[in-house]
C-alpha cells in the first residue's frame, strides 16, 4: 500500500486538502487513511488520559496545598497585626496612667529578671534551628557547643525532666515541653554525625579534630578513648572499602584508596595526637597536637572572652541579647577529666596494634579483590598506580620523619602488605594460564592424531594430511609461501627473528600439520608472555641492579625487586607445560608401539603416521615456538646472537661447564627432553621399517632353488689378468667377478632409502639414522648366519652353494657392511673394530671359495667394492652416511673414470639426494656423461613424470639435459639466503 509508506507530513497535507485527497487516492486508500487517523486520535486520547490521571492530579493537590498555605499566612499576618495593635493600646494606656514614684525602684530587679528569663526562653527557642544549620554545614563542634548551651539553659530555667521541683516556666509556656523533648535527640544525632565524619577519607585535619572534640565533650571521654574511636572508625572504613561491589577496573581505585587511607590515617594520627618533646621546635610541614589545642580553645579560660564565640557573632545585634545573664554569654563547655597528652610510647603501641589488626583484614580483602583481576597486566597497573601514589608521598621528607616519630621505623606498604599477595595471584594466573595451554595442546594433539588415523593416503579431503604420509610430496611441491615476499632485497641477517619461509620449513622437513600445531602453541605462549612482560621491566636497564641510588631513594619501593621470582615462576610453569605435552606424546607413543608390534603391514598403518607426526612435533617445538624459549630464558637471553657466541666459545674451550647459566641449562634440558622423545618416536618408526624390510630381505636370501638364485643374480665384470706360468712365461687369463650386489640387496637398500626419504631423511636426528643402520646390519648378519646354518644341514633338492654364489654372497655382505656401518664411531675411535659375527660369516663364505682363486680375486673384488660404493653414494644418499659422502676425494682417484662417479657437494646441503658437481674441471666431463646417459634413458621418462613413483626424481635428474653454462643454484648466494 502506497499510503502506508507515505510520511506523516504528507498525510496531514492530504487531509487538509480533501479535493486533492480524492484526486490522488482511491477509495480503499482513503479508507485506510481514515482508519489510520482514527487510530492516531485514539492514541492521543490515551496519552491525554494518562497525563491527566498521573500529572494533573499532582498539580491539583499542589494547588490546594498552596492555597491552604496562603490562607494560613494571611491568618498569621492578621494575628500579628492584632497583637501589635493590642500592645500599642497597652503602651498608650500605661503611659496615660500616673505612677507613684515610690513603686518604681522596687520593680526594677524583678523586671530585669523577667527580661532575662524571656531572653533565655527566646534563645532556647532559636537554638534548635542553629543546631540544625550547623549540622547541615558539617560544623559538629559548633553544634555541640550549642547543644551544651541548651542543656545549660535547661538547668537555669529548671526545665530538666529529672527535677522534682515544680517548673513555673513550663506551666506558663507549654511550648517549651516540646522544645525540651526535641533537644534530647540532638546528642545522638551529633554523635552519629561526628563518628560518620571520622570515617570519611577526604576530611581535613581540623574537621577530624573538631569531630573528636565533639565526641569527647558529649561522651566526656579522654584523649586515649578519642584515639581508639578514631582508629576504630578508620578500621571500619577500611573494611567498607574492601567490601565494596567489584567492577573490574574499579579494583585499582579501591586498592589505591586503601593505601591512601592508611597514609592519611597515620598523618592525621600525628597531627591530632602526637606532642613534641620539650625543646623541639614545631615543623610547619608536620602539624601536631591539634586535638589538644582545639580542646583548649573550646574549654580553656585563656585568653579571656574566647567562649563568647558561641553566641556573640550571631546574637549580639538582637535587642534581647543584653538581657542574657553572664553565665550564658560567656558559656564554655567543660570536661570532667583533664585532657592529658598521650605519651609517645602509648601512641606507638596503639598504632602498631592497629596496623597489625588491620593487616589481616587488608590481606583477606586484597586477596578477594585480586580474584577479580584476570590478567597480569592488570596486576602491573595496580602495582604501578600504588608506586606512583606512594612515590609522591615519599618524595616529601616529612613522611619519613612522621613514620619514625609514630612507629620508630618506616611503614612499608608494598613489601609488608601487598607484594606477597600480588605474587600469589600472579602464580595462580600463571598456573591457570599454562594449565589451559597444556589442556588445549593436549586436545589439539588428540584431534590431530584422530584426523591422521581417520584419513587415508587416498582420500583427497585434506592435502596437508597427505604430507604426513609422504614427506617427499611436501618437499618437492611448490607453494606461494616458499619464499618471503622481500627475499630478493632483504638479507637473512636483516630479517626478523621469527621470520621463516616455506623453503626453510621444507629444508627442516616440518610438515604443515606440525607447523599449525606449533603456531597455535606459540601464539598462546606469546599471549601469556606478553601479558607477563607487563609485570616485568621493559629492558635490562630497569632491573634493580641498574637503578641509581638517587632514583632508589626517591622511589617508594622497588617495583621490579621480584622480577627474578616472577621469571622463575614463568620458567617453572613453562617447563611443566612442555613436560605435560611430552608426557601426553609419550603415552600416545607407548600405546601405538604396543599396537604396531604385531602388525605385518605396519608401514601402511595410520598409527605409524601418527608416530611420525609426534616425532616431528617434538623435534620442531624448540625451533618453531620461539616464545617458549623466551619463557624459559627470558626476553634478553633468548636472542640468537648470544647463543651463537656461547656455542662458539664452547667449541673453543673458553667456557667451562661450571660457567653455564642456569637458565641456559634449563633450556638445554627442555631441548634434550624434546629430542629424546623425538628419537623415541623415530625409533618406533625405524623398528617397524627395519622389521618389514629385513623380513623381505631374509626371505629372498634364504631362497635356495636354482630359479631364485638366477633371478637375483646380476651381471659380472670380466677382467684380464696376467699370471706367470711354470715355464716363466706370462699367461693372460680372464676372470669374472661380481660388480653389482644382488637384486634383493639393491632392492633392500633402495627400499630403505626410499622409506627414509619418504619421511624427510635429511632432517632425521643423526642418532636415529645410526641406530637404524646398526639395527639393519645386525638383522642382515643374522640372516646370513641363518643361511650358513641351513647350508650346513643338507636338504634334498636344495641348490648347493657354488663358488660363484659364494663370491656373490661375500660381495653382498661386504658391500652391506660398508654401506650400513656408521662412520661416526669409527672416526672417533681411530680404527674400526671388526665384528666377530661378520668375520665368522665371512670366513664361512671364504671357505667355500678356492684359496688360490680367493687370493687372486680379493684385490679386484675390493676395487669393485670401492667403485660401487662411490657410484651408489647418490642413489643411497642418506643410507651411506653423510660422513662418507662429504669427505674430500682422495689422491687415488682414478682420472680415467670421472664420469662414472657423481659426488655430492663439499659442504652440508639441505637435500641429501640433490647431485652437484664438485669442481669445475670435472664439470664438462660429468655433463657429457649425463648427456650420454640421457640418450639411453628416454624410454623411462614415462615413469619419471609421476612424482609419486619411487626414484622418479633421480630418473628425472638423469634424463633431462643439463645446461653446463648455468651455475648451480646452491652456489648463488642470494638464492641460498632465501631458503633460510
UniProtKB/Swiss-Prot annotation:
InterPro entries: COG1. It is a peripheral membrane protein. It comes from the Eukaryota. The keyword Zinc-finger does not apply. One of its GO terms (cellular component) is trans-Golgi network membrane. Its main location: Golgi. GO terms for biological process: glycosylation; Golgi organization; intra-Golgi vesicle-mediated transport; protein transport; retrograde transport, vesicle recycling within Golgi. It is found in: Golgi apparatus membrane. Required for normal Golgi function. Component of the conserved oligomeric Golgi complex which is composed of eight different subunits and is required for normal Golgi morphology and localization. It is linked to Congenital disorder of glycosylation 2G: A multisystem disorder caused by a defect in glycoprotein biosynthesis and characterized by under-glycosylated serum glycoproteins. Congenital disorders of glycosylation result in a wide variety of clinical features, such as defects in the nervous system development, psychomotor retardation, dysmorphic features, hypotonia, coagulation disorders, and immunodeficiency. The broad spectrum of features reflects the critical role of N-glycoproteins during embryonic development, differentiation, and maintenance of cell functions. This is Conserved oligomeric Golgi complex subunit 1. It comes from Homo sapiens (Human).
Amino acid at each position: 500500500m502506497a499510503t502506508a509508506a507515505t510520511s506523516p507530513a504528507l498525510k496531514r497535507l492530504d487531509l487538509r486538502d480533501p479535493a486533492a485527497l480524492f484526486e490522488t487516492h482511491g477509495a480503499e486508500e482513503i479508507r485506510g487513511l481514515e482508519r489510520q487517523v482514527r487510530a492516531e486520535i485514539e492514541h492521543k486520547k490515551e496519552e491525554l488520559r494518562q497525563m491527566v490521571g498521573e500529572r494533573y492530579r499532582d498539580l491539583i493537590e499542589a494547588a490546594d496545598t498552596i492555597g491552604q498555605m496562603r490562607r494560613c499566612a494571611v491568618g498569621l499576618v492578621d494575628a500579628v497585626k492584632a497583637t501589635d495593635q493590642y500592645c500599642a493600646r497597652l503602651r498608650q494606656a500605661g503611659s496615660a496612667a500616673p505612677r507613684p514614684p515610690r513603686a518604681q525602684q522596687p520593680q526594677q530587679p524583678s523586671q530585669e529578671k523577667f527580661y532575662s528569663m524571656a531572653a533565655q526562653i527566646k534563645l532556647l527557642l532559636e537554638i534548635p534551628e542553629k543546631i540544625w544549620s550547623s549540622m547541615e554545614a558539617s560544623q559538629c563542634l559548633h553544634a555541640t557547643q550549642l547543644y551544651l548551651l541548651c542543656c545549660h539553659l535547661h538547668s537555669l530555667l529548671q526545665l530538666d525532666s529529672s527535677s522534682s521541683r515544680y517548673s513555673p516556666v513550663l506551666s506558663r509556656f507549654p511550648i517549651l515541653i516540646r522544645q525540651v523533648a526535641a533537644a534530647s535527640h540532638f546528642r545522638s544525632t551529633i554523635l552519629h554525625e561526628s563518628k560518620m565524619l571520622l570515617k570519611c577519607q577526604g576530611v581535613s585535619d581540623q574537621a577530624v579534630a573538631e569531630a573528636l572534640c565533639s565526641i569527647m565533650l558529649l561522651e566526656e571521654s579522654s584523649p586515649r578513648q578519642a584515639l581508639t574511636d578514631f582508629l576504630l572508625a578508620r578500621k571500619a572504613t577500611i573494611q567498607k572499602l574492601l567490601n565494596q561491589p567489584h567492577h573490574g577496573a574499579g579494583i585499582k581505585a579501591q586498592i589505591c584508596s586503601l593505601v591512601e587511607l592508611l597514609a592519611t590515617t597515620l598523618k592525621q594520627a600525628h597531627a591530632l595526637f602526637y606532642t613534641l618533646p620539650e625543646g623541639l621546635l614545631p615543623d610547619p610541614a608536620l602539624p601536631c597536637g591539634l586535638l589538644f589545642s582545639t580542646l583548649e580553645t573550646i574549654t580553656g579560660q585563656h585568653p579571656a572572652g574566647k567562649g563568647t564565640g558561641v553566641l556573640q557573632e550571631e546574637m549580639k545585634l538582637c535587642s534581647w541579647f543584653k538581657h542574657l545573664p553572664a553565665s550564658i554569654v560567656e558559656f564554655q563547655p567543660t570536661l570532667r577529666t583533664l585532657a592529658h597528652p598521650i605519651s609517645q610510647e602509648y601512641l606507638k603501641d596503639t598504632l602498631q596494634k592497629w596496623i597489625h589488626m588491620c593487616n589481616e583484614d587488608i590481606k583477606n580483602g586484597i586477596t578477594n579483590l585480586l580474584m577479580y583481576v584476570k590478567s597480569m597486566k592488570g596486576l602491573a597497573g595496580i602495582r604501578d598506580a600504588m608506586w606512583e601514589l606512594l612515590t609522591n608521598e615519599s618524595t616529601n621528607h616529612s613522611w619519613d620523619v612522621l613514620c619514625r616519630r609514630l612507629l620508630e621505623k618506616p611503614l612499608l606498604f608494598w613489601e609488608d602488605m601487598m607484594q606477597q599477595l600480588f605474587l600469589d595471584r600472579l602464580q595462580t594466573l600463571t598456573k591457570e594460564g599454562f594449565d589451559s595451554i597444556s589442556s588445549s595442546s593436549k586436545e589439539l594433539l588428540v584431534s590431530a592424531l584422530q584426523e591422521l588415523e581417520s584419513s587415508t593416503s587416498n582420500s583427497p579431503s585434506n592435502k596437508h594430511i597427505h604430507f604426513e604420509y609422504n614427506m617427499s610430496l611436501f618437499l618437492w611441491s611448490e607453494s606461494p609461501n616458499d619464499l618471503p615476499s622481500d627475499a630478493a632485497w632483504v638479507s637473512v641477517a636483516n630479517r626478523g627473528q621469527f621470520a621463516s619461509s616455506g623453503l626453510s620449513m621444507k629444508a627442516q622437513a616440518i610438515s604443515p600439520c606440525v607447523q599449525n600445531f606449533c603456531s597455535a602453541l606459540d601464539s598462546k605462549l606469546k599471549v601469556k608472555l606478553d601479558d607477563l612482560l607487563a609485570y616485568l621491566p621493559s629492558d635490562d636497564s630497569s632491573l634493580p641492579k641498574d637503578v641509581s641510588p638517587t632514583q632508589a631513594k626517591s622511589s617508594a619501593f622497588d617495583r621490579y625487586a621480584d622480577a627474578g621470582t616472577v621469571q622463575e615462576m614463568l620458567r617453572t610453569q613453562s617447563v611443566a607445560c612442555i613436560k605435560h605435552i611430552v608426557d601426553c606424546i609419550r603415552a600416545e607413543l607407548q600405546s601405538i608401539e604396543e599396537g604396531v608390534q604385531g602388525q605385518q603391514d605396519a608401514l601402511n598403518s595410520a598409527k605409524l603416521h601418527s608416530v611420525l607426526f609426534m616425532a616431528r612435533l617434538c623435534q620442531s617445538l624448540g625451533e618453531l615456538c620461539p616464545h617458549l624459549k623466551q619463557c624459559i630464558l627470558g626476553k634478553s637471553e633468548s636472542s640468537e646472537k648470544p647463543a651463537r657466541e656461547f656455542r662458539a666459545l664452547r667449541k673453543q674451550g673458553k667456557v667451562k661447564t661450571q660457567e653455564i647459566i642456569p637458565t641456559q641449562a634449563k633450556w638445554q634440558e627442555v631441548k634434550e627432553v624434546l629430542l629424546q622423545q623425538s628419537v623415541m618416536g623415530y625409533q618406533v618408526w625405524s623398528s617397524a621399517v627395519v622389521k618389514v624390510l629385513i623380513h623381505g630381505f631374509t626371505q629372498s636370501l634364504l631362497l635356495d632353488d636354482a630359479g631364485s638364485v638366477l633371478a637375483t643374480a646380476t651381471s659380472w665384470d670380466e677382467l684380464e689378468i696376467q699370471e706367470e706360468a711354470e715355464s716363466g712365461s706370462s699367461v693372460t687369463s680372464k676372470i669374472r667377478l661380481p660388480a653389482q650386489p644382488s637384486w634383493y640387496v639393491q632392492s633392500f637398500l633402495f627400499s630403505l632409502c626410499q622409506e627414509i626419504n619418504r619421511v624427510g631423511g635429511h632432517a632425521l636426528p643423526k642418532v636415529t639414522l645410526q641406530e637404524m643402520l646398526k639395527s639393519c646390519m645386525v638383522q642382515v648378519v643374522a640372516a646370513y648366519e641363518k643361511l650358513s646354518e641351513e647350508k650346513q644341514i643338507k636338504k634334498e633338492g636344495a641348490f648347493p652353494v657354488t663358488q660363484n654364489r659364494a663370491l656373490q654372497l661375500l660381495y653382498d655382505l661386504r658391500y652391506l657392511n660398508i654401506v650400513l656401518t656408521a662412520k661416526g664411531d669409527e672416526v672417533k675411535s681411530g680404527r674400526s673394530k671388526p665384528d666377530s659375527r661378520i668375520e665368522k660369516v665371512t670366513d664361512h663364505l671364504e671357505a667355500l671359495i678356492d684359496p688360490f682363486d680367493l687370493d687372486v680375486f680379493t684385490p679386484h673384488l675390493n676395487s669393485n667394492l670401492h667403485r660401487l660404493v662411490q657410484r651408489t653414494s647418490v642413489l643411497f644418499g642418506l643410507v651411506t652416511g653423510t660422513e662418507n659422502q662429504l669427505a674430500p676425494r682422495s689422491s687415488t682417484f682414478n682420472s680415467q673414470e670421472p664420469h662414472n662417479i657423481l659426488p655430492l657437494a663439499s659442504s652440508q646441503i639441505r637435500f641429501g639426494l640433490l647431485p652437484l658437481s664438485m669442481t669445475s674441471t670435472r664439470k664438462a666431463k660429468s655433463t657429457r656423461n649425463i648427456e650420454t646417459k640421457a640418450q639411453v634413458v628416454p624410454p623411462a621418462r614415462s615413469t619419471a613424470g609421476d612424482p609419486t613413483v619411487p626414484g622418479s626424481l633421480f630418473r628425472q635428474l638423469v634424463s633431462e639435459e643439463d645446461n653446463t653454462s648455468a651455475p648451480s643454484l646452491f652456489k648463488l648466494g642470494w638464492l641460498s639466503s632465501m631458503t633460510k
